[in-house]
Each structure stands twice: as C-alpha cells, then as structure tokens.
Amino acid sequence: MTEGARDFRGKGRAFRGVLGGESYRRLAALFGFQERFYRRAVGDLQLGPGGRALDLGCGPGGLSYALAEKSPADASIVGADISDDQLECARRGAGAFACGMEFLRASMDELPFPDGHFDLVMTSMALHETPPAVRRAAITETARLLKPGGTFLLVDWSRPRFGLWGIIWYPFCRWGERNRDNWNNVYPELCRERGLNLKEDDYINSISRRQVFVKEG
C-alpha cells in the first residue's frame, strides 16, 4: 500500500484533526509552544557531520527547525506526520536551514526506514494524541531505527507540577484511559523494555516533561 493510499484513521491526530497547519501552529503558540519551547526541548542535543534525525509526529515542524538551527549542512532531518496540512506547513519553512530536511506522510508506528538508520529520534507533544497501542508500537519502531548508542528525545505532557499551567491543565490531564500513560509516566519502563535507557529527565514547564534515552550497544 502506498503512503498516499494508507488509511490512518484511528492513529490519532492533534486536536482530533479539527485544526492543522498554520491554524494549529498559531493556536499551539498561544499555549507556549513557540521557538523558545522547542529550543529548550532540543537542549544540547545536536547532529554531527552526516548525522540523521527523525521527528515523529512532527506537526508544523517546530522541533525539527530547532534541531536544524544547530545542524551542519551535510546532516539530514526527516519529519513524519499523518496530517497533510501539518506537513505542508512544515515544508514551507524548511528552506531556511542549511541541512537537508524532508517531511513525509507516515505514521510513527510504521516507518519506511531500515534498521539503525538514525542517530537521533525525537518527538514532541505527539505521543499523547495517539492510542496507547500506537504509542507502544512507535517506541518499538524508535528502538529499531536508532543506531546503537543513538538518542531518543521524548517531550510530552506529564503529571503537572505546581505553577499556573499545572493548575490550568490538571482537570484535562487527570482522567481518561488515553491520558493514563502520561499521567503515570510509563515511558521509562516502555523504553527500558526495548533497550532504551533513561539518561535525562526534567521539565520544560509545569506540564511538559523532557526525557532523553540512549539505545544500548
């Protein structure tokens, strides 16, 4: 089945597919997901010469852009998303960076790349939009796609800390089967089971947790 024909229903989509592309980007910015957020998410991670990165659920490209800002010209970044609107928005800004950038329509649990293809796999505020089974399959794919010693950057909401955003988001985060993984922070365990070991764990703001894992080997 080709990418264009693949049925992504049930895979999950930001804002349940109501908003996408530029509308999504503007609304997300109102909630603090701007350049500064994505730069903090990337932190000191970077690609070396010829390095390759994959952005799962890339949306309009904010996390990919933050990494591209500090990447050499011969590095490459691939963003994957199931929303054509998001991908179109991401592609519009890709030409501003020296490194290679590609944005393709693909689901994070079924990716068209060989084993050990990437030095870095990353995702920001995307896993919680997918069903639990898709999340687990996406982490399995991440472990498959990373080179030994490669890095997995996972940024998503977690149990809120004290602070304004924590107070605002608490009622939305606390209940529901879809939210349970994030509330209970099951990702370190899921990653460890797949050979990805936790190296960094902190918060970007009151609800956005940043975790860095390294693949064994």
Summary of predicted features, one role per range:
Residues 7, 31, 153-194, 198-210:
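C-terminal alpha-helical "lid/dimerization" subdomain adjacent to the S-adenosyl-L-methionine
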Residues 23-40:
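Conserved SAM-binding loop and adjacent beta-strand
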Residues 54, 59-110:
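Class I SAM-dependent methyltransferase SAM/SAH-binding core
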Residues 1-22:
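N-terminal, positively charged/glycine-rich alpha-helical extensions of SAM-dependent methyltransferases
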Residues 50, 73, 146-151:
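Short glycine-dipeptide loop
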Residues 120-133:
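A short SAM/SAH-binding and catalytic strip from SAM-dependent methyltransferases
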Residues 136-148:
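A short glycine-rich, Lys/Arg-flanked "PGG" loop and its adjoining helix->strand segment in the class I
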Residues 109-120:
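A short acidic, Gly/Pro-enriched loop at the edge of an enzyme's catalytic core
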